[in-house]
């Protein structure tokens, strides 16, 4: 793989495969904004300041007769910005419910995408997630149980859309461009987190919190149109690809080993130590990232005592750093490989180690610098930024060791990660309710 200078032919960034990476970037952008929308909106949905003035609030739905209270004006509180009395434990369950849904579909969707093609499966998952995002404000009016159900099904849809991406890259990404292409696509999640955290609070204040769901749900529907128009399962069947690019991709992929059969070698996978290292990496990575992504707006608003608008803006800063580090890490990884400066295994280990060690050090340091506004913000920026170096490490590693089963293995890997996400978000909500907001 390292000795193929021919894989550098052609105008890389003007090629169709980089166009596909941008479409996947947009789809990942869309899915993460839909996932994080609730983390922003919930600050207004369970606004404790407003709740204190509402004596007849329901535990599962909005305040039905809020307008009967003459001390609350229509401008301050209306049916478009209902307040719900959801405890920290309930919020933790709501946050983690989308992970329950994702984990249900990760493994089967990864396997089926490898057999039947990823285009339809990913597109359907994105469309379902977008429609359920539009439905979320109405679901909240019917009670917390329906919200949990909607988020669970939404997670199932996003699980379909997540894992199949590696099936496409197994057929579209030349080995020496894998880090670049996958990190361009994957950085959409970090950039989406930046956008939703930056503008979500502004939308909530200017238009009321339901519009957070309406705007990003509609964005997902637009993304679906692009997806079904531009994305194809492999370069052989794409009507717009040039002959030169098609030959470049096919010739580079022809030199890597492949398995002709569809049977999954489960026994070999179970006994493969590198795979277990990847699974453990996903578990550790998702544990920290889920806590940061889910509770960062609340942490910022309570620790730094800022309003929802400023909380969203501050919470967004770490994720622009994450998007930048993701892309730069991919460029650096492929540079090291293409110049034969480091072996493939060394590059993956290097980026995996940096992506796990550096954010952990920053997270451990946070409680000790809580009194310093500037240092706290710097550490919160560094945590997601350095964590996304993993995208050029173990996260892409399944494409290296088993490209034929990349989506199936990615489903299992994300399953380990989402188990960590479920445990961490639920445990965090429980600890907050028991210990209280000590910060």
Curated annotation (Swiss-Prot):
The function of this protein is: Acts as a membrane potential-dependent organic anion transporter, the transport requires a low concentration of chloride ions. Mediates chloride-dependent transport of urate. Can actively transport inorganic phosphate into cells via Na(+) cotransport.
Q: Record's Pfam families?
A: MFS_1
* Taxonomic placement: Eukaryota, Metazoa, Chordata, Craniata, Vertebrata
By sequence similarity, the record places it as follows: Belongs to the major facilitator superfamily. Sodium/anion cotransporter family.
UniProt gene name: SLC17A2
What superkingdom does the record give?
A: Eukaryota
Protein name (Swiss-Prot/TrEMBL): Sodium-dependent phosphate transport protein 3
Glycosylation: which residues? 47, 56, 68-69
Q: In which tissues is it expressed?
A: Expressed in the small intestine, kidney, spleen and testis. Not detected in fetal brain, bone marrow, and mammary gland.
Intracellular or extracellular location(s)? Apical cell membrane
- What is the organism field in this record? Homo sapiens
Q: Does the keyword Aminoacyl-tRNA synthetase apply?
A: no
Q: Membrane-spanning residues where?
A: 98-118, 130-150, 183-203, 211-231, 273-293, 317-337, 350-369, 374-396, 415-435
Catalytic activity annotation: 3 Na(+)(out) + phosphate(out) = 3 Na(+)(in) + phosphate(in); urate(out) + n chloride(in) = urate(in) + n chloride(out)
Q: Name one GO cellular component term.
A: apical plasma membrane
State the membrane topology: Multi-pass membrane protein
GO BP terms: namely:
phosphate-containing compound metabolic process; sodium ion transport
Q: What is its main location?
A: membrane
**Keyword list, A-Z:** Cell membrane, Glycoprotein, Ion transport, Membrane, Sodium, Sodium transport, Symport, Transmembrane, Transmembrane helix, Transport
GO terms, molecular function: sodium:phosphate symporter activity; transmembrane transporter activity; urate transmembrane transporter activity
